[in-house]
From Swiss-Prot:
The keyword Transport applies. Residues 358-594, 607-851 form the ABC transporter domain. It comes from Burkholderia pseudomallei (strain 1710b). Keywords: ATP-binding, Cell inner membrane, Cell membrane, Membrane, Nucleotide-binding, Repeat, Sugar transport, Translocase, Transport. Belongs to the ABC transporter superfamily. Ribose importer (TC 3.A.1.2.1) family. PROSITE patterns: ABC_TRANSPORTER_1, ABC_TRANSPORTER_2, RBSA. Its main location: membrane. InterPro entries: AAA+_ATPase, ABC_carbohydrate_import_ATPase, ABC_transporter-like_ATP-bd, ABC_transporter-like_CS, P-loop_NTPase. This is Ribose import ATP-binding protein RbsA 1.
C-alpha cells in the first residue's frame, strides 16, 4: 500500500483515503503531494467536461485548500479523510440523480403539463444536480424542482411547482392577509379536506359585503343624502384620531337635520349633508396634503374658540344671569354697552374669539370614588390676568394640573391659541408655552438657585458642556426683574421660604411662557414683596402674557386681576369682571353662604394675670439683640414683622429646634432648659410649623397615626402594644371637636384639603394636652371659609386656658385676633402693642422703621 502511494496510484490512494487510512512515517511534503494527486483523480473520475464548464483536456485548477496547504509549507490537513468520505457520499447521490434523469428520458410522457414550458433540465442539468460555489469549492445538491418532481411521482399532492424567482418574491403565505388573491402555495400545503377553507372565507366575505350594500340601500331609501355624508364624516373622524370635537348630548346627524329644518329646506343631496356636518366641527373630506390637514385642524380650533352651540350657550346665558343677580343692579351705561356689544359685526366677534388664548370646554375629571371636576368651562384672553377662586377642594389645583399635563382629562377639550391640544405630560405643556408656579415647591434642596432655574434645560456649548456663566447671568437678570436679592451659590434649602417662592416664580418666568399659572404665589410673601410681584405681573400683561392667578386673598384679586371665575365643589359657578362685583358677592359664590364676620370678638383679659411663659433672655445669633417677653394664660400673643425679621427664628430657638446663644426662661414659674424639641414637648410647648405638609405631617400616614404619633404611650396595652381601638375613638372625638371633614380616621392625610390638614396638626397637640401652642402661619394656603373656622378654633382654645403665640404675615389676622402684638425688626422686638394701639399703620411703622414706641414693653 505504501508503494502504491509512493508511485502515485490515484485509484488505490482514493480507496485508502475513503477507508480512513493515514500512512505513518511518511514525510509531510510527500503526504501532501499524495493526497493532492488523489483528490485530482477523484474529480476527474466524478465529473465530465460539460459538468465542469470547461473544454475537454483542460488542466484542472488546484483547489483553494491545496494551494493554501502549499503556501503553508506542506502542512497536511488532518481532516482530509473526512472530506473525502463526504465527497464519496456526494458522488453516490449524483449517481442516483443521474439514474432518475435517465428514467425520465425513457418516459417523457409522464412529465406533467403544469410545468408550463419550464423543463426540469433548465434548473437541474443533465446530471440532475445544482452546482453551487461556496468558498471556491464546487458543490452539488438536488435542486428544488427535482425534489418537488420526485414528490409528484411518488403520488403526493402538489398543485404546481414554483417558478423561477418565487424564492425572491417573499409574498405572504397566509391567505387571510390577502383575501382577494389567495396564495396558491399556501393552499398547496393544506390537506385535501381543508382546501375549501379559503373558499369558505371568500363566500363569507362576499355575504358580508352583500349585507352592507343592502343596509346602505335601505338607509338611502330612508334619507338619500345621509349615507355618503355619514361615511365621509366617519372617515374624517378616524383620520383625526379622535381630535374632532363632538357636541355633547346631541349627535351630529340630529344636529344636521335640525339645522336643515331651521334653514327652511330639506336638501337631500350628499354635498348639502356634508356641508351641514362640517358645521358640526368636521374637517373637509379627504385632505389632499399635510397642509390641508393642518388647515383643517386650525378650522376645528377656531370653531372651538368661538364657543359651543345648543346646551352650552343656554348654560352660559343662565350663568350670566346668575352673575348679574349676584353683582347687583346695573346702570344704563352697562345696558348700552351690552346693547352695542350685541349689535357688533360678525367680524369683530370673530376677532374677539381669536384673541382667546385658552379655551377649556366641558373638562371632567374622575378619581377613584370621587368626581373632582364636572364640565368646567374657562376662557382666558391674551394679556389678561384671570383669577380663579374657590374653597379648598373646589378643584382649582386639579384643573391647573390638567392644563399642565400632569393629569389627563376624562372628558372635554383644551384649545390653546384656537388649536385643540392634549398634553401627555408636563414637558408637552412647557413646550406649548404653559408655565406654572405650584403651591408646593418643586425645587431640589441640594441644588442652588441657578441649577433649579435651568434644571432639565441647561444651556450647553459646542462641546456639550454647560455654560454656567451664561446661566448665572440669566438667573441674575431674572431676579433683578423681580427686585429680590438671592444668593445664587447657596443651596436652596438654606434660603428662606419667601426666597424659595421667588425662585419658583423666576423658574416660570425663565420659560418665556405665553400662559402663566400662579398657584398661591403670595402665600409666603410680605405685602411689600407681593407688591413687587404684582408689578412684574403687570409688565408681563403689557407684553401679552396671559396669567391665571389663584389666591385666597381677595384684596389681591381686586388689585391686580381683570376677571374672576369661581368654582365650588368641582363645578363651574360663574365668571364676572372685577369692576362689577364686590367681596361679599364673591364670598357668597365661593362658600354658598354669606359670612358676616371673620374674626370672633376679643375677650377682656386681666393685666395682672399670671404668666405661663417668661422669657428672660433670648439671643438667637452671636452679637444679636436679646429679647424678653411674657405670655399670659388664655392670651393670643402675635409676632408681627416682615419676612426675615426674626419671628420664626425666635420661635424655633424657643423650643430648642434652633441653637441659641442665650436661652433663659421659666414655665409657670419654674426654670427650664429647652435644649431640644423633646424637652419643649415635656414642658408642654408645641409648635405648628410654617410648612405643614413637609414639617407638620407625615403625608403617607392616616389621620389616626398623625394625631397619635406624639403620644403613643397614651393608648398602650400590655406595655409594648398600642390599643388601636382606643386611638380610633380618640381620633373620632378630636375630628368631631375640630370639625375635620374626612370619611374615616384611616383616611390618608395627604388627600385632605389645607384647612383639614391644619386641623389635624392642631388635634395632635390637643391629644398631647399641650397648653402652650405656637402657630406659625396657620392660615397659609387655606380658603376664606376654613380661615374663619381656624380663627374661631383659636379663640375657643384661648377661652379654655390655652396660651397661643401667633406668627403671621397677614396684618388683618394680627390686628383682628391678637390680644397683644410683638413687632419684630431685624431680630429685635421693636414694640409691644396692646389694646387700641394694635392698628395696621402702627404695626407697619414699627416693622419698617427704626422708631420705638412709648409703649415699648416686654412683659
Amino acid at each position: 500500500m505504501r508503494a502504491s502511494l509512493e508511485n502515485g496510484d490515484d485509484h488505490d490512494a482514493h480507496r485508502l483515503v475513503d477507508a480512513g487510512f493515514r500512512p505513518p512515517g511518511r514525510p509531510r511534503a510527500a503526504r501532501r503531494r499524495a493526497f493532492a494527486r488523489a483528490r485530482r483523480g477523484e474529480r476527474r473520475a466524478r465529473g465530465t467536461a460539460e459538468d465542469r464548464h470547461d473544454v475537454p483536456g483542460a488542466e484542472q485548477p488546484v483547489l483553494r485548500d491545496d494551494a493554501k496547504g502549499a503556501r503553508r509549507g506542506g502542512r497536511v490537513d488532518r481532516r482530509a479523510g473526512d472530506r473525502h468520505r463526504r465527497a464519496s457520499r456526494r458522488e453516490q447521490a449524483g449517481e442516483r440523480r443521474r439514474g432518475h434523469a435517465a428514467e425520465e428520458d425513457r418516459h417523457p410522457a409522464r412529465e406533467p403539463d403544469r410545468f408550463d414550458g419550464h423543463p426540469v433540465g433548465r434548473r437541474v442539468g443533465e446530471e440532475g444536480g445544482r452546482r453551487r460555489r461556496r468558498g471556491g469549492r464546487e458543490r452539488e445538491r438536488p435542486g428544488r424542482r427535482v425534489r418537488r418532481l420526485e414528490e409528484f411521482r411518488r403520488g403526493r399532492d402538489v398543485v404546481r411547482l414554483p417558478r423561477e424567482g418565487d424564492r425572491r418574491r417573499r409574498r405572504s403565505r397566509d391567505p387571510r392577509r390577502h383575501p382577494g388573491r389567495a396564495d396558491s402555495r399556501a393552499r398547496a400545503r393544506l390537506p385535501r379536506g381543508a382546501r375549501e377553507i379559503p373558499e369558505r372565507e371568500d363566500r363569507r366575505r362576499a355575504e358580508r359585503q352583500a349585507g352592507a350594500r343592502e343596509r346602505a340601500r335601505r338607509h338611502r331609501e330612508h334619507d338619500p343624502g345621509a349615507p355618503v355624508a355619514q361615511g365621509r364624516l366617519q372617515r374624517q373622524r378616524r383620520r383625526l384620531d379622535g381630535r374632532a370635537v363632538r357636541d355633547r348630548g346631541v349627535g351630529p346627524r340630529h344636529q344636521a337635520h335640525e339645522r336643515r329644518r331651521r334653514a327652511g329646506g330639506d336638501r337631500g343631496d350628499a354635498e348639502a349633508e356634508l356641508e351641514v356636518h362640517r358645521d358640526v366641527r368636521a374637517v373637509p373630506a379627504r385632505p389632499d396634503s399635510p397642509r390641508d390637514r393642518h388647515r383643517a385642524r386650525e378650522e376645528v380650533g377656531r370653531q372651538c374658540a368661538e364657543g359651543d352651540s345648543g346646551r352650552r350657550e343656554a348654560d352660559r346665558q343662565g350663568q350670566r344671569e346668575d352673575v348679574q343677580l349676584v353683582s347687583g343692579p346695573r346702570d344704563e351705561a352697562d345696558d348700552m354697552d351690552e346693547a352695542s356689544g350685541a349689535a357688533r359685526a360678525p367680524d369683530e366677534a370673530s376677532e374677539e374669539a381669536m384673541d382667546t388664548i385658552l379655551a377649556l370646554t366641558g373638562i371632567t375629571k374622575r378619581f377613584p370614588g370621587v368626581v373632582a371636576l364636572r364640565g368646567i368651562d374657562l376662557r382666558v384672553a391674551r394679556g389678561e390676568i384671570h383669577a380663579l377662586l374657590g374653597e379648598n377642594g373646589a378643584g382649582k389645583s386639579t384643573l391647573m394640573k390638567i392644563l399642565c399635563g400632569i393629569h389627563p382629562p376624562d372628558e372635554g377639550v383644551i384649545a390653546l391659541d384656537g388649536e385643540p391640544r392634549r398634553f401627555a405630560n408636563h414637558h408637552d405643556a412647557i413646550a406649548a408655552g404653559v408655565g406654572i408656579v405650584f403651591q408646593e415647591f418643586s425645587l431640589i434642596p441640594e441644588l442652588n438657585a441657578v441649577d433649579n432655574l435651568f434644571l432639565g434645560r441647561e444651556w450647553r456649548g459646542r462641546l456639550g458642556l454647560r455654560e454656567r456663566a451664561r446661566m448665572r447671568r440669566a438667573a441674575a437678570d431674572i431676579f433683578a426683574r423681580l427686585d429680590v436679592a438671592i444668593d445664587l451659590s447657596a443651596p436652596v434649602r438654606e434660603l428662606s421660604v419667601a426666597q424659595q417662592q421667588f425662585v419658583e416664580i423666576g423658574k416660570a418666568l425663565s420659560l418665556d411662557a405665553r400662559l402663566l399659572i400662579l398657584d398661591e404665589p403670595t402665600a409666603t410673601l410680605t405685602p411689600a414683596e407681593a407688591a413687587h410681584l404684582f408689578g412684574v405681573m403687570r409688565e408681563l400683561k403689557r407684553r401679552g402674557v396671559a396669567m391665571i392667578f389663584i389666591s385666597h386673598h381677595l384684596d389681591e384679586i381686586f388689585e391686580v386681576c381683570d376677571r374672576i371665575t369661581v368654582l365650588r365643589d368641582g363645578q363651574y359657578v360663574g365668571t364676572t369682571e372685577v369692576a362689577r362685583t364686590d367681596v361679599g358677592a364673591l364670598v357668597e359664590m365661593m362658600v354658598g353662604r354669606r359670612i358676616e364676620q371673620s374674626f370672633p370678638p376679643k375677650p377682656r383679659l386681666a393685666r395682672d394675670a399670671a404668666p405661663v411663659l417668661e422669657v428672660d433672655a433670648l439671643q438667637v445669633r452671636e452679637n444679636g439683640p436679646v429679647n424678653r417677653f411674657a405670655l399670659r394664660e388664655g392670651e393670643i400673643l402675635g409676632f408681627a414683622g416682615l419676612v426675615g425679621s426674626g419671628r420664626t427664628s425666635s420661635a424655633l430657638a424657643l423650643i430648642g429646634a434652633k441653637p441659641a446663644r442665650v436661652r433663659r426662661m421659666r414655665v409657670r414659674g419654674r426654670p427650664v432648659c429647652l435644649a431640644d424639641p423633646a424637652a419643649a414637648l415635656a414642658a408642654g410647648i408645641g409648635l405648628l410649623p410654617e410648612s405643614r405638609k413637609t414639617q407638620g405631617l407625615i403625608p403617607a400616614f392616616s389621620i389616626r397615626h398623625n394625631i397619635a404619633i406624639n403620644n403613643l404611650g397614651k393608648h398602650r396595652r400590655l406595655r409594648w402594644f398600642v390599643d388601636a381601638a382606643a386611638e380610633t375613638r380618640t381620633t373620632l372625638e378630636l375630628m368631631q371637636r375640630l370639625g375635620v371633614k374626612a370619611p374615616t380616621p384611616h383616611t390618608r392625610v395627604d388627600t385632605l384639603s389645607g384647612g383639614n390638614q391644619q386641623k389635624v396638626v392642631i388635634a395632635r397637640w390637643l391629644n398631647h394636652h399641650t397648653r402652650i401652642l405656637i402657630f406659625d402661619e396657620p392660615t397659609r394656603g387655606i380658603d376664606i371659609g376654613a380661615k374663619a373656622e381656624i380663627y374661631q378654633l383659636m379663640r375657643e382654645l384661648s377661652a379654655r386656658g390655652y396660651s397661643i403665640v401667633l406668627i403671621s404675615s397677614e396684618l388683618p389676622e394680627i390686628v383682628g385676633l391678637c390680644d397683644r402684638v410683638a413687632v419684630f425688626r431685624q431680630g429685635r422686638i421693636e414694640a409691644m402693642l396692646e389694646g387700641e394701639a394694635i392698628e395696621p399703620n402702627t404695626v407697619m411703622t414699627y416693622a419698617t422703621s427704626d422708631v420705638r414706641g412709648a409703649n415699648h414693653e416686654h412683659a
